[in-house]
Amino acid sequence: MGGDYTYIGNQYHLMAGNRDLYIDLLLFHRRLRSLIAIELKIGEFEAEYAGKMQLYLSALDEQVKLPEENPSIGIIICKSKDKTYVEYALKNSNSPIGVATYKLRNTLPEDMKEMLPEPEEIAKRLRIFEE
């Protein structure tokens, strides 16, 4: 993600009235001087994700953002999206929200394989926790 992002937390807890809110991933972008709320979804984009993100951004701006910082930004990452549906869902939103997709792969790229241990080594290390 680059050197301009600072990790703040995962499942970051906020309150809205008496309701608990949990943001999947909260980052801070140094150059933008903005909090970045990221929501990870396993399926296709749904309009209610935008409403929930607006709630998160409002709570962040009221409770966490410092006066000298810019408004918080939301990113919703889904497995798939219908571009027109996303545009309609975000059309009247005043909050900066983006929607992105991800792709799953069955194999790791070659350069990443070199960085990770073999599956047998991972299994061996995990057995330590079973004991």
What kind of region is each of these model predictions?
Residues 1-131:
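Charged, terminal alpha-helix-loop-beta segments
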